[in-house]
């Protein structure tokens, strides 16, 4: 079996790359009305979760995601709050996060895995974990914010594009 630490290394790299792509966008220009209009109702989200997980894992993911799911007007308020504080948040995140390529280099120098292939996975395998990571815990993350903003699919595509982290 794969070492938990090795999986965490690869997952951390993927999330750092996702954060970089997210932080390159101008959240302050988000069309909140369009994001709210495009927001799926809970039954559609549940169908998506159940198509991502099987059995008891699906039940767990549904329960966890329902905790953080926002109805349209709640979503409008949440997005507005995030946008209002975005410059401070963006500045803090930019200071705290290590660039993905720098972290990959640090891992390599330490003899740790820095590419999915180092632990017998592919970039496609790692990509497939993104919705699972978003749905499996009730904690609100950048993946959730990206989904609410309508950017999730585009950002995942950018992370795993030909000029992405693992090319």
Predicted regions and their residues:
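A conserved active-site cap/scaffold subdomain adjacent to cofactor or substrate pockets
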Residues: 1-23
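C-terminal charged capping/lid subdomain of soluble metabolic enzymes
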Residues: 25-167
């Amino acid at each position: 079996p794969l070492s938990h630490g090795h999986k965490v290394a690869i997952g951390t790299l993927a999330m750092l790359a996702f954060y970089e792509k997210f932080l390159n966008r101008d959240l302050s220009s988000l069309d909140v009305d369009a994001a709210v209009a495009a927001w799926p109702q809970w039954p559609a989200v549940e169908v998506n979760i159940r198509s991502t997980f099987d059995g008891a894992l699906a039940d767990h993911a549904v329960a966890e995601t329902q905790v953080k799911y926002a109805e349209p007007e709640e979503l409008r308020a949440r997005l507005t709050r995030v946008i209002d504080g975005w410059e401070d948040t963006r500045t803090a995140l930019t200071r705290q996060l290590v660039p993905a390529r720098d972290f990959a280099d640090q891992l390599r120098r330490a003899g740790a895995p820095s590419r999915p292939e180092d632990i017998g996975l592919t970039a496609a395998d790692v990509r497939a974990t993104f919705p699972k990571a978003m749905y499996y815990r009730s904690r609100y993350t950048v993946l959730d914010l990206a989904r609410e903003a309508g950017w999730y699919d585009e950002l995942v595509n950018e992370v795993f594009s030909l000029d992405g982290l693992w090319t």
